From Swiss-Prot:
Catalysed transformations (reactions): D-glyceraldehyde 3-phosphate = dihydroxyacetone phosphate
This protein's record includes keyword Iron: no
CDD domains assigned: TIM (cd00311)
Protein name: Triosephosphate isomerase
Species of provenance: Salmonella typhimurium (strain LT2 / SGSC1412 / ATCC 700720)
Pathway recorded for this protein: Carbohydrate biosynthesis; gluconeogenesis; Carbohydrate degradation; glycolysis; D-glyceraldehyde 3-phosphate from glycerone phosphate: step 1/1
The protein's role, per its UniProt record: Involved in the gluconeogenesis. Catalyzes stereospecifically the conversion of dihydroxyacetone phosphate (DHAP) to D-glyceraldehyde-3-phosphate (G3P).
N-terminal signal peptide: none
Protein's GO biological process: gluconeogenesis; glyceraldehyde-3-phosphate biosynthetic process; glycerol catabolic process; glycolytic process
Gene: tpiA
Family: Belongs to the triosephosphate isomerase family.
Length: 255
């Protein structure tokens, strides 16, 4: 049985005070939680501080992006080796905000995926369709294309130990969310698509839902068989709300 993972993407939010306070509150709120893996991805400059604040807890660290290169003259970038060295394990790639604002292509994201795997880190591959693509009935086509960028270059084996986050772009930060049934249908499609290449790996891969996940809709989402957790944005900045989501995942997958 897949072990659920709830990960907080803090995006461009944080300060030394905020990191210490939020992690301390998370530790209190998550006391006794063992049935759901928990990770947080602060801005890069706060990963080390968050790691120290989380020391001795079950909270794992992640990052929001990575560069293709391991070292060299690449101003402003952060390598997989650096993230590994500082203690980050779950690395978000392909987020719609990176695809949109930084023009990241499927091919570039697939290369980042490969670099992370080579370094023993866990890629959290974000995929999902825009509102226009959704309305045009292209959800499955878009998700398949984004997955195939990895499948066709690295094979299904690359997804072993990796995480996929289905984030419909129209639901990110908008307050809108796919219904549990809509989300489940896409998650099942993603799993079935990978299963065409390798059924065993498809069954094992964690597929998170992201897109305005909050304390009120989490339990219903996690009740779906192919939703294995969540990649949480705004709600991850509030310890109590994030903890409700984590506990909902734990309860749903133990049921």
């Amino acid at each position: 049985m897949r072990h659920p993972l709830v990960m907080g993407n803090w995006k461009l939010n944080g300060s030394r005070h905020m990191v210490n306070e939020l992690v301390a509150n998370l530790r209190k709120e998550l006391t006794g939680v063992a049935g759901c893996d928990v990770a947080i991805a602060p801005p890069e400059m706060y990963i080390d501080l968050a790691k120290r604040a989380a020391a001795g807890s079950h909270i794992m660290l992640g990052a929001q992006n990575v560069d293709l290169n391991l070292s060299g003259a690449f101003t402003g970038e952060t390598s997989a080796e650096m993230l590994k060295d500082i203690g980050a394990q779950y690395i978000i790639i392909g987020h719609s905000e990176r695809r949109t604002y930084h023009k990241e292509s499927d091919e570039l994201i697939a290369k980042k995926f490969a670099v992370l795997k080579e370094q023993g880190l866990t890629p959290v591959l974000c995929i999902g369709e825009t509102e226009a693509e959704n309305e045009a009935g292209k959800t499955e086509e878009v998700c398949a294309r984004q997955i195939d960028a990895v499948l066709k270059t690295q094979g299904a084996a690359a997804f072993e130990g990796a995480v996929i986050a289905y984030e419909p772009v129209w639901a990110i930060g908008t307050g809108k969310s796919a219904t549990p049934a809509q989300a489940q249908a896409v998650h099942k499609f993603i799993r079935d698509h990978i299963a065409k290449a390798d059924a065993k790996i498809a069954e094992q891969v964690i597929i998170q839902y992201g897109g305005s996940v909050n304390a009120s809709n989490a339990a219903e989402l996690f009740a779906q068989p192919d939703i294995d957790g969540a990649l949480v944005g705004g709600a991850s900045l509030k310890a109590d709300a994030f903890a409700v989501i984590v506990k909902a995942a734990e309860a749903a997958k133990q049921a």
